[in-house]
């Protein structure tokens, strides 16, 4: 694995009044790896991710993303990353082509670049016949695949995926992970949050958050060996019980 750090987090904390959602977490992510940010719903995963991508300010601690300080260089962080939110981020009342054009413009692509990438994107997804249809008419699985592809339009160094397979069927989940693998093989770093513990098996390394803290961080193989279990779900259950 490439040991060049592309994300470096030190004692990152987020408080909402008296409630601490993220409790002084520290970890590194290496260039080109698929890093799983796991935990149950409400564990603090999305809150932590929002701090890393510059849309939420940390209460304390430090983080470098793609070499840029998330506190002082937020705009450069945003230019260096792709982001797919937990909720579908395309516009249902725009066509597929209009959505691609809109987000391509946000990412600063030229008209020619947008045109070229539109042709390639719809071909890769097999959506040539739906390019002029409203995105709202697409099934959820296709919407998720489209969101992922659009997040990569500007060829970011890192793509952040927040619960990307939530609500989709097992076949679509597997297809989505095939897309993730293909992008990682190009050298893109993938930072993915999920509460599906079986998806941890697809990651190079995973961290597991429990009640705002990172309770474990290693490869899936090493974590299963450490806790003497056969699945990542069993690892999570042991960690959760230890916290209780």
Which functions belong to the PLM regions below?
Residues 101, 105, 112-130:
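Conserved ABC ATPase "signature" region
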Residues 217-218:
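ABC ATPase "signature
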Residues 148:
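Hydrophobic anchor residue at the start of the ABC signature
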Residues 93, 134-141:
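Conserved ABC ATPase signature
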Residues 159-163:
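Catalytic Walker B motif of ABC-type/P-loop ATPase nucleotide-binding domains
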């Amino acid at each position: 694995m490439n040991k060049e750090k592309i994300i470096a987090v030190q004692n990152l904390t987020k408080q909402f009044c008296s409630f601490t959602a993220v409790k002084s977490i520290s970890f590194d992510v290496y260039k080109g790896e698929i890093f799983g940010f796991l935990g149950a719903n409400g564990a603090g995963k999305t809150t932590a991710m929002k701090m890393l991508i510059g849309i939420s300010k940390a209460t304390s601690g430090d983080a470098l993303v793609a070499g840029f300080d998330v506190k002082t260089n937020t705009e450069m962080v945003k230019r260096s990353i792709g982001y797919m939110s937990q909720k579908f981020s395309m516009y249902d009342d725009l066509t597929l082509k209009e959505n691609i054009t809109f987000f391509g413009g946000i990412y600063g692509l030229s008209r020619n670049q947008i045109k070229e990438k539109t042709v390639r994107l719809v071909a890769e997804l097999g959506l040539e016949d739906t390019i002029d249809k409203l995105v709202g008419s697409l099934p959820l699985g296709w919407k998720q695949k489209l969101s992922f592809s659009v997040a990569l339009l500007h060829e970011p160094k890192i793509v952040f995926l927040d619960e990307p397979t939530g609500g989709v069927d097992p076949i679509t989940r597997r297809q989505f992970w095939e897309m993730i693998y293909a992008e990682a093989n190009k050298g893109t770093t993938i930072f993915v949050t999920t509460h599906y513990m079986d998806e941890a098996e697809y990651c190079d390394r995973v961290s597991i958050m429990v009640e705002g803290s990172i309770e474990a961080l290693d490869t899936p193989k090493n974590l299963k060996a450490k806790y003497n279990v056969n699945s990542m779900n069993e690892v999570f259950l042991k960690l959760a019980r230890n916290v209780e």
